[in-house]
């Protein structure tokens, strides 16, 4: 028997994780996505990246990284990209667990390992990451505007409170086939996260949260943490009636 390293003992063996598929929505992430996919692929060999109508070389970067590539001819939004990726992944032989994973380097493989481990060992259908799951100094690293928006979403959503979620718009989620087969996101924009919450509640999916560390870099901040982005999250949910 060959010796195992600490990563494998923690569930990081790529062979063991062949039943896990990472779904990575991508829009104009050509400068970073290759490194993100290569890093994740060392632990999770099955990755599908959905190029959501990018105008840069994202598709070429995805090819170089060795991930599966699905392309939208035009930009449809993150919700549509996730739905496309889940539909692709759930049709692959042996797929049991599914992960929504950001293309910009914010999410960490170590958190995915922990969340997958919980699905394997606990009676839950979906584990959602939270930036607010434990008292820690790192919470201060969440941009102020982002914190205000996320807290407002929880306050306005009875379903979110009923499910005990503290960070409904966290893009790091791990779920089983029951969720993957029942997922039918109709909101293409940022409000798909609130729609996820609605589906959790209406389908009776067993939900858990896991504290995660989000890496806020200068690049990721420029892509998605602005005041306009926060306003869009709220307006999409309210107009689309996705803050039930």
Regions found by a protein language model. Give the residues of each.
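Hydrophobic helical membrane-anchoring modules
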Residues: 1-17, 160-162, 185-244
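Short, well-formed alpha-helical segments that are part of the catalytic scaffolds
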Residues: 5-7, 24-43
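Cell-envelope/extracellular polymer assembly enzymes that use nucleotide-activated donors
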Residues: 19-21
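Conserved sequence signature across two-component system core domains
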Residues: 26, 50-52, 72
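Acidic helix N-cap motif at the loop->helix transition within catalytic regions
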Residues: 31-35, 56-65
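A conserved acidic beta->alpha catalytic loop
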Residues: 51-60, 105
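Acceptor/aglycone-binding surface of glycosyltransferases and processive sugar-polymer synthases
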Residues: 72-88, 97, 109-190, 217-234
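Short beta-strand-to-loop acidic/aromatic patch adjacent to the donor-nucleotide binding site
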Residues: 94-104
């Amino acid at each position: 028997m060959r010796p195992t390293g600490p990563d494998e003992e923690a569930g990081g063996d790529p062979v063991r994780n062949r039943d896990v598929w990472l779904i990575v929505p991508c829009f104009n992430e050509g400068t970073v996505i290759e490194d993100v996919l290569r890093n994740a692929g060392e632990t999770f060999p099955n990755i599908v990246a959905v190029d959501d109508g990018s105008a840069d070389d994202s598709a070429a970067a995805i090819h170089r990284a060795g991930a599966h590539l699905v392309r939208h001819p035009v930009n449809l939004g993150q919700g549509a990209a996730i739905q496309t990726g889940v539909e692709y992944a759930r049709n692959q032989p042996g797929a049991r667990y599914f992960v929504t994973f950001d293309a910009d380097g914010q999410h960490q493989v170590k958190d995915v390992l922990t969340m997958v481990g919980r699905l394997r060992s606990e009676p839950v259908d979906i584990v959602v990451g939270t930036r607010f799951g434990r008292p820690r100094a790192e919470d201060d690293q969440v941009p102020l505007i982002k914190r205000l928006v996320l807290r407002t979403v929880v306050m306005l959503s009875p379903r979110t409170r009923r499910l005990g979620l503290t960070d409904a718009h966290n893009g790091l989620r791990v779920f089983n086939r029951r969720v993957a087969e029942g997922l039918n996101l109709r909101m293409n924009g940022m409000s798909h996260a609130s729609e996820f919450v609605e589906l959790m509640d209406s389908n009776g999916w067993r939900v858990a949260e896991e504290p995660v560390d989000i890496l806020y870099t200068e690049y990721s901040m420029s892509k998605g943490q602005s005041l306009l982005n926060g306003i869009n999250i709220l307006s999409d949910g309210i107009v689309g009636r996705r803050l039930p």
